[in-house]
C-alpha cells in the first residue's frame, strides 16, 4: 500500500498520499477579520480620539479633551438580534473633559457616543438582523512612485507621484525639452525649481549646489521665470487659487495647510515607512561608484575612497556610519514656507553610463522618525533628487501591480476611516456650539452632538460597497467571503477603468493571493482570495511564510519567517518539493528556485528560503480540489467558484477522494459548533450539548463549570438554504479546546461535505448527454440523495394609514370559509399547515377611502342596494412557486414592547419550508469545473449496469474531458472507485497528491482491471456495450441554480404604465418577450394572424385584450385587434416633436384614436355580465 493514514478530527481517517511533511499548521482562516477588528477596538479607536483631541474654540479659551472610552455589554445576544431584526451592537461611552482656561474650571463627563456594531466570533456583523461581512480592500499604498513613459516621438521620460493616505498629490514629470515640471494637487504644471524656491532655496546658485549641476536642471532654471522665494510663492498661489489676490503670507499658509499640516495631510504609518524605504540614501547607493571619499567625521578614518563601487559588503560595513553622521548637511532655507533648518543627507557619486566623469548628488531624506505623519521639506527634496538621479539611470522605477505597492485595508482600518469622517463632522458642530453657548453653563454633554458619528457608522455598514450581505450558501462560501480581497469600492478602482495589468496574475501574488479563485465576468482579477497561509502585517501588506535556510550550514531549518513581497525580492526561494535529507540538507546540488519572478536553477549555496507547503500558493476553496495539478487553470477557476454554490443537502457525505483541507475549512468557517474549553461531554440533545470543564487546581485536574452549547435548528440562511446543526459527540467523550462538537450545514463528521459520492460512467446514451448534459438514475430521486431543504421567509406588516390602522384579522371580505381553514383566530396561518400557491398566510384588511364608483358599481348598488364595505383585502398570500409547509410563525407587537419601524403596529413573519428533490433542469457539477444540466432522469432498470448488477448513478459525456483539459476528474474517478472497493477515504493534497503510479497502485490493490475500465450492460436490452467504459466514484454537487426557482408562466398579470405591455421577469410576474428575432421568424413563416395576435391582443391592445378575454370566457370568436398602445405612444412622441401625424385606414378615412381613459366603460352591460358572472361564483 502507498500513502500513510492521517486522522482528521475525532471521526475520520484518510489515507494521505502527501510526500512533503507539513512544517507549519494552517493558521486560523478568518483571522484576517477578527484580528483587524480587535486592533480597531484596542488601538484604532484610541488613535481616532487622540487625533481630534483637544477641540478648542476659535478664541482658544475652551478646550474639549477625549480621555478614555469603554464599550458596554450588548443589549441582545447574536441569536436574539437575528430574531428581532436589530443590530448586534454595544454602547460606546467616552470620558470627556472640558477645560475653561479663563476660570481654570474643569468638567468631566461620560458621554454616550451611540451603539457600535460588534463582530461575532465567526467574523461577521449582524446589521438589522442580517449577517454581513466587511470585505478587505486592496488599494495602492501611500508612497512615492516613479514610472517611465515614452512620448509620441519615442523619447523616454519619467513621471513621479507622491501619494498620501489623504491630502494633496505632488507629481513630477519631464517634457520633450528635458525640463522637469511639478504639478501640485492636479493643477497646471510649474517648473520644479519654483517649488524649491518656495521652500526657501531662492537663488539659482542654492538650487544648483543642492542638486548638483546637470543639463536637466539648467533647462528647468531657464524655463523658470521666478527668481526669488517671494515670486515663487505668488506663482504657486495663483495656480492653486486662480482669481484671488495673491500675497506672500496667504501663499505660505496655503502651502503649509496643503502639505505640512498633520490634520490635512496624512501619510499614515505605512506611507512614512514606504517613503523612508524608497528615499533613504542607503537603498540608493547600492552598486554605485563614489565621487567623494567618505570619512568618519569623529575619527577622521577613511571608510571608502573615491571611485569605490559600493557592493553589498562595503555598504553593510559603512551602514552604521550612514545611519549616524556621514554626509549630513543642514540647509538653511530663507523666507520659505517652513521655518527652521532642513536636515539632509547628500553623497556624490558618478553617473553609471557617463563616459566623462559626470558627478550627481544623491540626497536622502535623512532619518525622519516614524511618528512624523505629514510630508517634510526633506522628503520633497529627496523625492526631487531621486527624480533627477533617475534621469541618469540611478534608482529604479516602480511596478504598481507589485504587492509591495498594494496593501489591504481590512475591517479595522475601513471602520477607522469611517469613524474619522463622523468625528470630524462632530468636531465642527462642537466648535460652533462653543462660540454660541454661555461659557459658564456649558457641559461636555451639551457640546457634543453624536448624530454625525452614528450616521457615518450606519452608512458604512448599511450601504458601503465593501459591506456585503454574507454569502451563506454553504460553509465554504461563508469562509471564502470572509477572506475575499476586493480592488473595488471607495478609494479603489472601478470595473470600467481597470485595465489588463491590474487584473493579471503577478509574480508577487505567490503565496499571498490565489492565482485561480476569481469571478468570471467583468470583475475578473479585481476580486481575489487570500492564499491559505497568508497573513496581513501591521502596514496592511500581505505576508507569506518561508522556512529559513541557515546561511552557515546551508541546512533548511524549522524556523519560519513571514515575508512581504518587497522583502521577498531580496532573496532566492526554493520550492517546497525540493528533496531534503533528514537533517534538512538539499539532496541535489542544483536547485530550482524563484528570484524576483524569474524561475532559475541555481547552486544550493545561494538559497535563502524555502516554501513551507505546496498549497501555500492557492486559497482555501482551490485547495479543496483534488488533482488540481492535472486540471487546466480555467476549469480549476470554475471548480473553485462552483463549490461555493453547492446547496446543503439533506444527508451530506464528505468526499471519498478529498484533499485534507475539508476538516480545516469546515472548522474555521463558523458553521460548526466548536468546543471552547477542554472537558467531558455530559449530555447530548438535538438542541444543545453540555460540556463539563476540566480545571487545573494545584496540579490536579478537577471538574469545573458547565458549558452549554446551543445548536441552530432549521434556520433560514441568508440565501434561503437550510441552516441546521447536528451533534457528533456522545456522552462521556473527552473533548479538547477547538474540537468540533456539532456539524453545521454541508458537513459530515466534522468535514466539509458539499455533495455526494456517486457512481459515474463516462459514456453517451442516445444523445441525451449531448453538450455537457447529465443523465441520472431515478434512484438518486427516490433515495433523497440530492434532496435539499429550502426555507423562504414572508412578512406582512399592519401599518397606520391616513384612513385608520390596518388590521390583521380572519374576517376578510369576499373570501370563503374554505380559504380560511388553515388560519387561526388571529388570522395567521398555523404552523405545520401545507400551503399552495395563492393560499392565505396572513389575513389583513386596509381601510378604504370613499372612492368614485364606476358605472357598473353604481348599477349594482341600485339593483342590490348593498353598502360597499369600507375595507379592502390586502392579505399576504403564497407567491407562485412558494408552496410548502409552514415551519414557523413569528408575531411582533408594538404593545409587547418589540422594536418596530415607525408607523408599524404589528409584524408577522411566516417561514415556508420546501423539500426539493433533484429534477430535470437542475444544474450539477464536479470539483473540476465540469458542470452540466440534468436532461433526463432514467428509471433504475434502464441505466447501464456493472457485471455484478449494480446500475450506475450518472452518465457524463466523455467529450467533456479532452477539450476542457480537466483530467483531474478522470483520476478522481478511478481513485474513488478503488477507495470504495477498499472501504477507505483518501486525502490527496494539491500539488503533492497521488501521482499516476499511486493511482495505478491503489487500483491494483483494490483488485480492479488493469485498465481501470469495465464492461457495462445496457439496462434496456441486457446486451453488453461495445467498448469498455470508465466507471468510478466521483464527487458531484448540486448547485444553487435550481429549475424550481427559474420556471415561470403567466396568463394575465401586471402591465407597464406607459406602453401597456406586460412587465418582464419572474419577480414582476411578467410575460415572455417576443423580440425582433422572434418576429422575423414568424414573418419568415408567413404566419400573419399569429403575428398580429402577438403584437396586439396578447400584448398592448388595451381594448382588444379585454374583449378577447370576454370572448374566450363566453366561447365566442375572438374580435378584430385594435391599435396597440405602443403605436399610440410612438404617434404622441412624434407629435411632441411638432410633427402632424395622423393614422389613415385603407379607404383614406382618418382613424380616430381615443385614449384609454376617455373610453367610457365600453359596453358596460357586457362587461357587467362578465363581472356579475364572476362574482356569483
From Swiss-Prot:
It catalyses: RNA(n) + a ribonucleoside 5'-triphosphate = RNA(n+1) + diphosphate. DNA-dependent RNA polymerase catalyzes the transcription of DNA into RNA using the four ribonucleoside triphosphates as substrates. It is an enzyme of class 2 (transferase). Keywords: DNA-directed RNA polymerase, Nucleotidyltransferase, Transcription, Transferase. The gene is rpoB. PANTHER family: DNA-DIRECTED RNA POLYMERASE I SUBUNIT 2. One of its GO terms (biological process) is DNA-templated transcription. InterPro entries: DNA-dir_RNA_pol_bsu_ext_1_sf, DNA-dir_RNA_pol_bsu_external_1, DNA-dir_RNA_pol_su2, DNA-dir_RNAP_su2_dom, DNA-dir_RNAP_su2_hyb_sf, RNA_pol_bsu_bac, RNA_pol_bsu_CS, RNA_pol_bsu_protrusion. Residues 1147-1177 are annotated as: Disordered. Residues 1162-1177 have a biased composition (Basic and acidic residues). This is DNA-directed RNA polymerase subunit beta. Coiled coil: none annotated.
Amino acid at each position: 500500500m502507498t500513502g500513510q493514514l492521517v486522522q482528521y478530527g475525532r471521526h475520520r481517517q484518510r489515507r494521505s498520499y502527501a510526500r512533503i511533511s507539513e512544517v507549519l499548521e494552517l493558521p486560523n482562516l478568518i483571522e484576517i477579520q477578527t484580528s483587524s477588528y480587535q486592533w480597531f477596538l484596542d488601538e484604532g479607536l484610541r488613535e481616532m480620539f487622540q487625533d481630534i483631541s483637544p477641540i478648542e474654540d476659535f478664541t482658544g479659551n475652551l478646550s474639549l479633551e477625549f480621555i478614555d472610552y469603554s464599550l458596554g455589554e450588548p443589549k441582545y445576544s447574536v441569536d436574539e438580534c437575528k430574531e428581532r431584526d436589530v443590530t448586534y451592537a454595544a454602547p460606546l461611552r467616552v470620558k470627556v473633559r472640558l477645560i475653561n482656561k479663563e476660570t481654570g474650571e474643569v468638567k468631566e463627563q461620560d458621554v454616550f457616543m451611540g451603539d457600535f456594531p460588534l463582530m461575532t466570533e465567526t467574523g461577521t456583523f449582524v446589521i438589522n438582523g442580517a449577517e454581513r461581512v466587511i470585505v478587505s480592500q486592496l488599494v495602492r499604498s501611500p508612497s512615492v512612485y516613479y514610472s517611465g513613459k515614452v512620448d509620441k516621438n519615442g523619447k523616454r521620460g519619467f513621471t513621479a507621484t507622491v501619494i498620501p493616505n489623504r491630502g494633496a498629490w505632488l507629481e513630477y514629470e519631464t517634457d520633450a525639452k528635458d525640463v522637469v515640471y511639478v504639478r501640485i494637487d492636479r493643477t497646471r504644471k510649474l517648473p520644479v525649481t519654483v517649488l524649491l524656491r518656495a521652500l526657501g532655496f531662492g537663488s539659482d546658485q542654492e538650487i544648483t549646489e543642492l542638486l548638483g549641476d546637470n543639463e536637466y536642471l539648467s533647462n528647468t532654471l531657464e524655463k523658470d521665470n521666478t527668481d526669488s522665494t517671494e515670486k515663487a510663492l505668488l506663482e504657486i498661489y495663483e495656480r492653486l487659487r486662480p482669481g484671488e489676490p495673491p500675497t506672500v503670507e496667504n501663499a505660505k499658509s496655503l502651502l503649509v495647510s496643503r502639505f505640512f499640516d498633520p490634520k490635512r495631510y496624512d501619510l499614515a504609518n505605512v506611507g512614512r515607512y514606504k517613503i523612508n524605504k524608497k528615499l533613504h540614501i542607503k537603498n540608493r547607493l547600492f552598486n554605485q561608484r563614489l565621487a567623494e571619499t567618505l570619512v568618519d567625521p569623529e575619527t577622521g578614518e577613511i571608510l571608502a575612497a573615491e571611485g569605490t563601487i559600493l557592493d553589498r559588503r562595503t555598504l553593510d560595513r559603512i551602514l552604521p556610519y550612514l545611519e549616524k553622521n556621514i554626509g549630513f548637511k543642514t540647509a538653511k532655507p530663507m523666507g520659505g514656507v517652513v521655518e527652521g533648518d532642513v536636515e539632509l543627507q547628500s553623497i556624490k557619486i558618478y553617473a553609471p553610463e557617463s563616459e566623462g566623469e559626470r558627478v550627481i548628488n544623491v540626497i536622502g531624506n535623512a532619518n525622519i522618525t516614524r511618528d512624523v505623519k505629514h510630508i517634510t521639506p526633506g522628503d520633497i527634496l529627496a523625492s526631487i533628487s531621486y527624480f533627477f538621479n533617475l534621469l541618469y539611470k540611478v534608482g529604479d522605477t516602480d511596478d504598481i501591480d507589485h504587492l509591495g505597492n498594494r496593501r489591504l485595508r481590512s475591517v479595522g482600518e475601513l471602520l477607522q476611516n469611517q469613524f474619522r469622517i463622523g468625528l470630524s463632522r462632530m468636531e465642527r458642530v462642537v466648535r460652533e456650539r462653543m462660540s454660541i453657548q454661555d461659557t459658564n453653563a456649558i457641559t461636555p454633554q451639551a457640546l457634543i452632538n453624536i448624530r454625525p458619528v452614528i450616521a457615518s457608522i450606519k452608512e458604512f455598514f448599511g450601504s458601503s460597497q465593501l459591506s456585503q450581505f454574507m454569502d451563506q450558501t454553504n460553509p465554504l462560501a461563508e469562509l471564502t467571503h470572509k477572506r475575499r480581497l476586493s480592488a473595488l469600492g471607495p478609494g479603489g478602482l472601478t470595473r470600467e477603468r481597470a485595465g489588463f495589468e491590474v487584473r493579471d496574475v503577478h509574480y508577487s501574488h505567490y503565496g499571498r493571493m490565489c492565482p485561480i479563485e476569481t469571478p468570471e465576468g467583468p470583475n475578473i482579477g479585481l476580486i481575489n482570495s487570500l492564499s491559505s497561509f497568508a497573513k496581513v502585517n501591521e502596514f496592511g501588506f500581505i505576508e507569506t511564510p518561508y522556512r529559513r535556510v541557515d546561511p552557515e550550514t546551508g541546512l533548511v531549518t524549522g524556523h519560519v519567517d513571514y515575508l512581504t513581497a518587497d522583502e521577498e525580492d531580496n532573496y532566492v526561494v526554493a520550492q517546497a518539493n525540493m528533496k531534503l535529507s533528514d537533517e534538512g540538507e538539499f539532496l541535489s546540488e542544483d536547485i530550482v528556485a524563484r528570484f524576483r519572478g524569474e524561475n532559475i536553477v541555481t547552486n544550493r549555496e545561494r538559497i535563502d528560503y524555502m516554501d513551507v507547503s505546496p498549497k501555500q500558493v492557492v486559497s482555501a476553496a482551490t485547495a479543496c480540489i483534488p488533482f488540481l495539478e492535472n486540471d487546466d487553470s480555467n476549469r480549476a477557476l470554475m471548480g473553485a467558484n462552483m463549490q461555493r454554490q453547492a446547496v446543503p443537502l439533506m444527508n451530506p457525505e464528505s468526499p471519498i477522494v478529498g484533499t485534507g483541507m475539508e476538516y480545516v475549512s469546515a472548522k474555521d468557517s463558523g458553521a460548526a459548533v466548536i468546543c471552547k474549553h477542554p472537558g467531558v461531554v455530559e449530555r447530548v440533545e438535538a438542541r444543545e450539548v453540555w460540556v463539563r470543564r476540566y480545571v487545573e487546581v494545584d496540579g490536579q485536574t478537577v471538574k469545573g463549570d458547565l458549558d452549554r452549547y446551543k445548536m441552530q435548528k432549521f434556520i433560514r440562511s441568508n440565501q434561503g438554504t437550510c441552516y441546521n446543526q447536528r451533534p457528533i459527540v456522545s456522552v462521556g467523550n473527552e473533548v479538547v479546546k477547538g474540537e468540533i462538537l456539532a456539524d453545521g450545514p454541508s458537513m459530515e463528521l466534522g468535514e466539509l461535505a458539499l455533495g455526494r459520492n456517486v457512481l459515474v460512467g463516462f459514456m453517451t446514451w442516445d444523445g441525451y448527454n449531448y453538450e455537457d448534459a447529465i443523465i441520472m438514475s431515478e434512484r438518486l430521486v427516490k433515495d433523497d440523495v440530492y434532496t435539499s431543504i429550502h426555507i423562504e421567509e414572508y412578512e406582512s406588516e399592519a401599518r397606520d394609514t391616513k384612513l385608520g390602522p390596518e388590521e390583521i384579522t380572519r374576517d376578510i371580505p369576499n373570501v370563503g370559509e374554505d380559504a380560511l381553514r388553515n388560519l387561526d383566530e388571529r388570522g395567521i396561518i398555523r404552523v405545520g399547515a401545507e400551503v399552495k400557491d395563492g393560499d392565505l398566510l396572513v389575513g389583513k384588511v386596509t381601510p378604504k377611502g370613499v372612492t368614485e364608483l364606476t358605472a357598473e358599481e353604481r348599477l349594482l348598488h341600485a339593483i342590490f342596494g348593498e353598502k360597499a364595505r369600507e375595507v379592502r383585502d390586502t392579505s399576504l398570500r403564497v407567491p407562485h412557486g412558494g408552496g410548502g409547509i409552514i415551519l414557523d410563525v413569528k408575531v411582533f407587537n408594538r404593545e409587547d414592547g418589540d422594536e418596530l419601524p415607525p408607523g408599524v403596529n404589528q409584524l408577522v413573519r411566516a417561514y415556508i419550508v420546501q423539500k426539493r428533490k433533484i429534477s430535470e433542469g437542475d444544474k450539477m457539477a464536479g470539483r473540476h469545473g465540469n458542470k452540466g444540466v440534468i436532461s433526463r432522469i432514467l428509471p433504475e432498470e434502464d441505466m447501464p449496469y456493472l457485471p455484478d448488477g449494480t446500475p450506475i448513478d450518472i452518465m457524463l459525456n466523455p467529450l467533456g474531458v479532452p477539450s476542457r483539459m480537466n483530467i483531474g476528474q478522470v483520476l478522481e474517478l478511478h481513485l474513488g472507485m478503488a477507495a470504495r472497493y477498499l472501504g477507505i477515504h483518501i486525502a490527496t493534497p494539491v500539488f503533492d497528491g497521488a501521482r499516476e503510479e499511486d493511482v495505478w497502485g491503489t487500483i491494483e490493490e483494490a483488485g480492479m482491471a488493469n485498465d481501470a475500465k469495465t464492461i457495462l450492460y445496457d439496462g434496456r436490452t441486457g446486451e453488453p456495450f461495445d467498448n469498455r467504459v470508465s466507471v468510478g466514484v466521483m464527487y458531484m454537487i448540486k448547485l444553487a441554480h435550481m429549475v424550481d426557482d427559474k420556471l415561470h408562466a403567466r396568463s394575465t398579470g401586471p402591465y407597464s404604465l406607459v406602453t401597456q405591455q406586460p412587465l418582464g421577469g419572474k419577480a414582476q410576474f411578467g410575460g415572455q418577450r417576443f423580440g425582433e428575432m422572434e418576429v422575423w421568424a414568424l414573418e419568415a413563416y408567413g404566419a400573419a394572424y399569429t403575428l398580429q395576435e402577438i403584437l396586439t391582443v396578447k400584448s398592448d391592445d388595451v381594448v382588444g385584450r379585454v374583449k378577447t378575454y370576454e370572448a374566450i370566457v363566453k366561447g365566442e370568436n375572438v374580435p378584430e385587434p385594435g391599435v396597440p398602445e405602443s403605436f399610440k405612444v410612438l404617434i404622441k412622441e412624434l407629435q411632441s416633436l411638432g410633427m402632424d401625424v395622423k393614422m389613415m385606414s385603407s379607404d383614406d378615412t382618418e382613424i380616430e384614436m381615443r385614449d384609454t381613459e376617455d373610453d367610457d366603460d365600453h359596453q358596460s352591460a357586457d362587461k357587467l355580465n362578465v363581472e356579475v358572472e364572476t362574482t356569483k361564483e
